[in-house]
Design a protein with these regions (language model features):
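Acetyl-CoA-dependent GNAT
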Residues: 2-3, 10-16, 21-99, 108, ...
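Glycine-rich acetyl-CoA-binding "A-motif" of GNAT/NAT acetyltransferases
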Residues: 70-74, 134, 160
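Glycine-rich phosphate-binding loop
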Residues: 102
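Conserved active-site alpha-helix within GNAT-family acetyltransferase domains
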Residues: 105, 130-148
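Conserved GNAT acetyl-CoA-binding A-motif
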Residues: 117-127
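Conserved beta-strand-loop-alpha-helix junction that forms the acyl-donor binding cleft
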Residues: 126-136, 153-157
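Terminal substrate-recognition subdomain of acyl/acetyltransferases
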Residues: 159-173
């Protein structure tokens, strides 16, 4: 596997949590990532509760994108609605020390390919808060397009953020 390649694998709590829990170091960044679904800083029990909740309610599975040594460089959760054939990506994050190298795009391309080829999704959706411009640009670079917006969906301190709904259709990557 070339140096800059990634592989998707299931998130393994005992191996991966300590690594990814260090990626978000600021409260505002944390709010952009999870919209208040977990405490800051990320605590193991709270993170497990969040993963269990989205697994039970939405069928989400957590994944990591790992480098050639098996070390996580990215994380996301994915579910598919088999009735509508729509996949959903959530809680996407990339190791901040690895940003700017195209790994976020590579991880998203792998995630979307997985969704289309292995879960039968016809489209994959995600939401991103409007202030998270870096993430939104990354999603757009993969082929995601904004199709809706919930104005004033989230408040952080004195700020009000919109929630942007984005989608990519099969064949759009």
């Amino acid at each position: 596997m070339p140096k800059n390649e990634l592989r998707l694998r299931p998130f393994i709590l005992c191996r991966d949590f300590e690594i990814i829990s260090k990626w978000i170091t600021q409260p505002r960044e944390h709010a952009m990532w999870c919209a208040g679904r977990t405490k800051f800083p990320i605590e193991r029990e709270d993170f497990v509760r969040m993963l269990e909740d989205i697994a039970e309610n939405c069928g989400d599975t957590p994944f990591v994108a790992a480098d050639i040594n098996g070390v996580p460089v990215g994380f996301f959760c994915y579910s598919v609605n088999t009735g509508s054939n729509e996949g959903m990506l959530k809680f996407v994050m990339v190791d901040p020390s690895m940003r700017g190298r195209g790994l976020g795009r590579k991880m998203l391309r792998l995630a979307v390919r997985y969704a289309f080829e292995f879960t039968g999704a016809e489209r994959v959706n995600l939401c991103v808060l409007s202030v998270n411009t870096g993430a939104k640009r990354c999603y757009e670079s993969v082929g995601f397009k904004e199709y809706g917006r919930d104005e004033g969906a989230f408040r952080y301190d004195n700020e009000v953020w919109d929630r942007c709904h984005m989608t990519i259709e099969k064949g759009g990557i």
